[in-house]
A protein has these predicted regions:
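Alpha-helical transmembrane-bundle signature of multi-pass membrane transport and export proteins
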Residues: 1-407
């Protein structure tokens, strides 16, 4: 019996999406485990907040370089093949890091190099995967599919860090990297099990540079799309680095250790999951433009509040609020962009969104890590959260009439 369209699980009626969703959920659990373990490993190896920020930055900086050409490639290429190759490369990188840690030969520079490799792969994987979803469910269920993906992303954000915190404390960091490597197998199996129509190479108008310019022109000329992209850039640059500094807060500010770090990361996931499930359930009745306009400054305020929380339960509550606001903003922005953009430009526009969403974060991480070394992690983070709030309020004061009415 078909799933009703207004069901919060409507997109799961599509077999290919069910496969993709299952594989991604398993893989994301491993990804979150590795993210926590990697930050803790770098802090152990270097005892430096700047190094923690640097490695996080190297994991995202390649997206600044490669995202736009990767978006052109995503519009031209077989997206399933691109995602498959990228997932296999990510598996290899995680396995190598697991071996280095298990054998005691790991050094900070090796972690940094592998982070850069992963970032380069992600530059091609993200736009291909984002634009692949619409091929699995069609535009009718796209909003629901994005909300469900966000639910999986954030449910695993609860489980992954919590398990990683226990493993780091009781077994060792290498186990987290090994489990992440194995988790990519689930995605590879799901991709091969899909039943898709034969792929046909699209006819490309102009060279690669011309197609990049075409995508940028579209964004510049549509004030709604431009506002959504600029808002993402502001939050990514000034707000998102709070995640990078969680190991520093866990060890040096709140003094709760690796297990406390797992709880902190999981609390972000709890707030984010609540937002994603709410969006999936009520998506037909929500003005996504209004969600973005309100969630953005709330996120900045929550980051600033966490920076000065010294009571652990209060820190957990503010982190949950950051997760809640962040997912409302990101999921609504993602859906609006994919709805507003023509099919032939979707890969390029989503690549630009990935560039500012993921690629600007390392610049913010470097800046925040540098400031943390001078004025301390709390002051650095509070400044970023406050700046994100002020700029976001100013931006939506100008663009709210155009964006708030979007559904």
């Amino acid at each position: 019996m078909p799933v009703p369209r207004l069901s919060p699980f409507a997109a799961l009626r599509h077999r290919n999406f069910r496969l993709f969703y299952t594989g991604q959920t398993i893989s994301l659990t491993g990804t979150w485990m590795q993210q926590l373990a990697q930050g803790w490993l770098v802090l152990q190896l270097t005892d430096s907040a700047l190094w923690v920020g640097l490695v996080a930055a190297l994991g995202s900086l390649p997206i600044l370089v490669f995202s736009l050409p990767a978006g052109v490639y995503a519009d031209r290429a077989n997206k399933r093949r691109v995602v498959t190759v990228c997932q296999a490369l990510l598996l290899a990188a995680a396995a190598l890091l697991a071996v280095l840690v298990a054998t005691g030969r790991v050094a900070a520079w090796q972690v940094a190099v592998l982070a850069a490799v992963v970032g380069t792969v992600n530059a091609f994987e993200i736009p291909a995967r984002q634009s692949f979803i619409v091929e699995l469910v069609g535009k009718e269920d796209l909003t629901n599919a994005i909300a469900l993906n966000s639910s999986a992303f954030n449910a695993t954000r609860i489980v992954g860090p919590a398990v990683a915190g226990l493993l780091v404390a009781e077994v060792g960091i290498a186990a987290c990297f090994g489990i992440n490597a194995l988790s990519y197998v689930a995605v590879l199996i799901a991709l091969q099990a899909m039943r898709l129509p034969p792929w046909q190479r699209p006819t490309a108008a102009g060279g690669g540079l011309d197609q990049v310019r075409e995508g940028l022109r579209f964004v510049r000329r549509d004030p709604r799309v431009l506002a959504l992209v600029l808002n993402t850039a502001v939050l990514s640059l000034f707000g998102f680095p709070y995640i990078v500094l969680l190991p520093v807060f866990a060890r040096d500010v709140l003094r709760v250790g690796a297990q406390g770090l797992g709880v902190m990361s999981a609390s972000i996931g709890i707030g984010a999951l609540a937002a994603a499930l709410g969006l999936a359930a009520f998506s037909p009745h929500v003005r996504r433009g209004m969600l973005v306009a309100w969630a953005s400054p709330v996120f900045g305020l929550a980051v600033a509040g966490f920076a000065y929380a010294r009571w652990f339960p209060l820190a957990i509550a503010t982190l949950a609020l950051t997760g809640f606001a962040m997912v409302l903003n990101n999921a609504a922005t993602n859906t609006l962009l994919q709805t507003l953009v023509p099919d032939g430009l979707r890969g390029r526009v989503m690549a630009l969104w990935a560039l500012v969403f993921v690629g600007f974060a390392p610049l913010g991480s470097l800046l925040t890590g540098w400031l943390a070394g001078g004025v301390g992690a709390p002051a650095a983070l509070a400044a970023g959260g406050a700046l994100a709030t002020v700029v976001s309020v100013w931006m939506w004061g100008r663009h709210a009439p155009q964006v708030a009415k979007l559904r």
